[in-house]
Amino acid sequence: MSIDPEIGSRHLLGTDGLAEQPNAMHQCVRIVITQDWANSVSGQLIAECLVNLLARQVGLVEELEIVSAAVPLLIHPIIKGVWQTLTEYLVAVGEWAVGMKVRTGDNSSPHEADHTIVIGGATTLDSAKTIACIADSWKAWVGELKNVPDDRPSPSLNPVGPFFAAALAAGEIFKRTWGLRRGRFLDNHAYSLWKNSMSSVWEELDAGPALNELHLPPFVLVGAGAVGNALVYVLTHLENRDMYPVLVDDDVYDKTNLNRCSLAGTEDLNQEKTAVLASRLEAVGIASFPFSGDLKRFVNDARAGMRADVAEEIGAGSYSMVVSCVDKGDGRQDIQGLHPQWLLGGSTFDLQAKTNVYAGEKDAVCLGCHNAREHQGEAMRGIERQLRAMSHQERASFLTEHGLEVAIVEEYINDSHCGHLGRAALMDFVSTPPPEFSVGFVSLGSGVLLAASLFRNLLSGETIPHASGMTTFNFLNGNLGEGSLARDPQCQICSKAAEYQDSISEL
């Protein structure tokens, strides 16, 4: 099966910091897994995630080759099937994701790879052309092979470090293939997501605690797109599966989603996003409640089939924990309007992955800050003025170029009235933003940061986080940092103006 090039359309748009055009296309990437790492859960998690991410770099990566001994599969598969060995499973992951053929073998093929990634250390390879990565619990390292720490895999089952290591390595392949105008390639970079710290010395960083005592309370996940996929991806590999996510999204998967939605494959096209995520969770023994609809519908829905205690709490208007993975102002405003006790958010921007904790303390930023609702009225008036200023021929050309039906829009422009099909078509056009750059490793990075933030708070014994905060990782330069957002004085939810309006309405 040939891979549909439309899958790569979003990451081929390019973004700030990258070269104007890719330096190379249709690259062959070889993944070498050393024996000790192939026989570890950490090594297998890195390998699975790497194949999943690299296969989705359609247009840039054309061929994957796995060099590994035939070791037993130790991790829970994310797709249905039975595999005896790790390499058999990795072949299936590439095929499932986008239809990519993955070659395997104990030794490298005669064909020279454009890029090589080593999971572990291999002194026989040309270190000048090779990236290496390792992970341990909450820690991840990526860099040039000559700098790889001399460390054997630990018995840790924690997916946080391995998934972050895979995202880092996939990001380095992307940057090296595309080329940079600014930023840097990572040559010796270690990270701990337990402490949100970075260093060039692997041993200095804290691997953090095990996750076997982690207990996730029921929570509502709003947004089952790329970042939501990444968070659920992490959850499917946890030891403790005693959790109950409520999944809310009104969308289905299209081809352009497959470059970054890590739990969706070609067989999931046109399927409800929440249903697909629920099926992935169910496959590893995690119960969930998928709701295909927007948040407003969810709040007013009877929620038939939801676990009784969770339905009772939500029915009373109480939201203990909500995770936001939506990318539009309206959705974020609606989520903040639930006034959850504990609110976290994950997002991406260009090559940056971000996560925020909103603790609700006095004068702190809320999810509604800097996320104003989109007002289509002015945009609608603007497009109407623009169209009426065109000649009939210019208008027809514009409408055809943007996929709008000329006849019904012409009828509306000449005789405007509400409810007309032409008006509906134009309203849909102005409310749909133009395609933006997105790529899988950034979305995966955001989901991992989100999971790490959630796990840290729970393991610290907090039922509600004591302070708001933001964690950002920039794949362009490898910087990991913590910070805070300033409150938006014009926020429609938490600003003084909003408080004043509420007090007036109560009189």
Predicted regions and their residues:
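Adenine nucleotide-associated cytosolic modules
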Residues: 1-507
